[in-house]
Design a protein with these regions (language model features):
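Short beta-strand edge/turn micro-motifs at domain boundaries
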Residues: 104-146
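Short solvent-exposed beta->alpha transition segments
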Residues: 30-34, 40, 44-91
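Secretory targeting and sorting signals
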Residues: 2-28
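Juxtacatalytic substrate-recognition/specificity segment
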Residues: 151-274, 365-368
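Acidic/His/Gly-enriched intrinsically disordered linker/tail segments
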Residues: 223-230, 250-251, 269-397
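Surface-exposed, charged secondary-structure patches
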Residues: 70-115, 243-245
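A short, structured loop/turn motif at beta-sheet edges
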Residues: 86-92, 119-124, 345-349
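Solvent-exposed, polar/charged alpha-helical surfaces in well-ordered, non-transmembrane soluble domains
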Residues: 37-44, 48, 56-60, 172-179, ...
Length: 397
């Protein structure tokens, strides 16, 4: 009997705990959902104000500072989707996805993670007190300052801390690069470029969400979705103004033509494409028509060839690491360029383009280069590498 009584008591306590859990769950969740709905409505009004260029409506949703910073950006879409809300006291923290499209350039949205802090006013209305990139997410250009916009014939340049005149020089470079790339690659691409010019190397690194040391000495990079589908946002050419400012006129144009080549070839570049081919081809287009010889354009590789002979093989993807040895990185780019230059000279420019596309069509790395070399160039990777090593000896030895 005693044991039976203890069992009954335990069950009663368990039932009470269960009811308490259910009551807390039923009472707490709707409250959080209600806050989430209200926060979403505030962000919907904020997004509508951005698209309508309505400064007063934007200010009515909270902190007005962000409006002036992005006012000049030509936007086709701007929206938020709340993913989490954490109420606390008289305020709340929220996580959201910001999706936007630049008018005339983005076919699909760019989506970035944002962190928001909200407060309630005396009437109980929610207001945005602060908005910033979520942890691990890059700082957008307008997070870094007021964006200035310059349009070119084939380009849209967005910059921070730069005058219209300074940004016009980047637009001119891009406007010359687009037709140069089309003459080499063809016209089956967007034939327009979005260029982002932050104030400094630190701004570039913040935009890309990486340490500044990763891009020191790198004049520009191109960001985009691998494969570049029909609904992909436009690639961005992101400039490192510190390194870019050290280049001469020819070097600046080569860099812009190189980066624009990445934009043009995006749809044919994927996991199957080795970096020696994608970077080498971009350099080949960049140097095309400049008259620069291998001795002039490949000084680090020339030094290596004259000191130790040609490398044993084509550059690996690991050789292209930005954070590694600068001389090794330079040799990798120069090695890729000379390989593509050799294909263009010995097989022809048409075959170089066909080879690039054939590698991408394979879809995955194993066998991609080997099969494309056999089907397009009629050679093997082993024989091609031997020819390239002799080519380096002849051109740089």
């Amino acid at each position: 009997m005693a044991g039976h009584g203890r069992a009954r008591g335990s069950g009663a306590v368990g039932l009470a705990v269960l009811l308490l859990v259910l009551l807390v769950g039923c009472g707490g969740r709707p409250a959080t959902d209600g806050v989430r709905t209200e926060v979403q409505r505030v962000l919907d009004r904020r997004a509508a104000a951005v698209l309508a260029h309505d400064a007063a409506a934007y200010a009515a949703t909270g902190d007005p500072a962000g409006y002036a910073r992005l006012r000049a950006v030509p936007l086709a879409a701007w929206s938020y989707r709340v993913t989490a809300v954490r109420p606390g006291g008289e305020g709340a923290e929220a996580d959201a996805e910001l999706s936007y499209r630049v008018e005339g350039h983005d076919r699909g949205p760019v989506t970035v993670a944002r962190a928001l802090r909200l407060t309630r006013d005396a009437a109980g209305r929610w207001n945005v007190a602060a908005e910033e990139p979520a942890r691990g997410s890059g700082r957008q250009l307008w997070d870094q300052g007021t964006v200035t916009v310059v349009r070119g014939a084939h380009s849209l340049v967005l910059g921070v801390g730069r005058s219209d005149e300074q940004l016009r020089t980047f637009a001119d470079l891009a406007d010359r690069a687009v037709p140069a790339v089309s003459r080499a690659w063809g016209t089956d691409w967007a034939r327009r470029v979005v260029v982002l010019v932050p104030k400094s190397l630190d701004g570039m690194a913040a935009l890309l969400g990486s340490p500044a040391s990763s891009y020191r000495g790198i004049a520009a990079v191109t960001t985009g979705e691998t494969g570049g589908g029909a609904d992909a946002p436009a690639d961005r050419v992101v400039v490192n103004p510190d390194a870019f400012g050290m280049l001469g006129p020819v070097g600046r144009q080569v860099v812009f033509t190189h980066e624009t080549t990445h934009v043009a070839t995006r749809a044919d570049t994927n996991a199957a494409t080795p970096l020696w081919l994608s970077e080498g081809y971009a350099d080949w287009v960049g140097y095309r028509g400049t008259g620069r010889t291998p001795e002039e354009a490949a000084p680090e590789l020339r030094k290596a060839v004259r000191g130790d002979g040609p490398p044993d093989g084509l550059p690996s993807d690991g050789d292209f690491g930005f954070a590694g040895d600068a001389a090794r990185l330079a040799r990798a780019y120069e090695g890729g360029w000379t390989a593509c230059r050799m294909i263009a000279e010995r097989w022809g420019e048409r075959e170089l383009h066909a080879f690039y596309r054939a590698v991408g069509e394979h879809g995955e790395r194993p066998g991609a280069v080997e099969e494309a070399m056999e089907s397009v160039l009629g050679t093997t990777l082993e024989d091609f590498t031997a020819q390239w090593r002799r080519y380096l000896h002849d051109e740089l030895g």
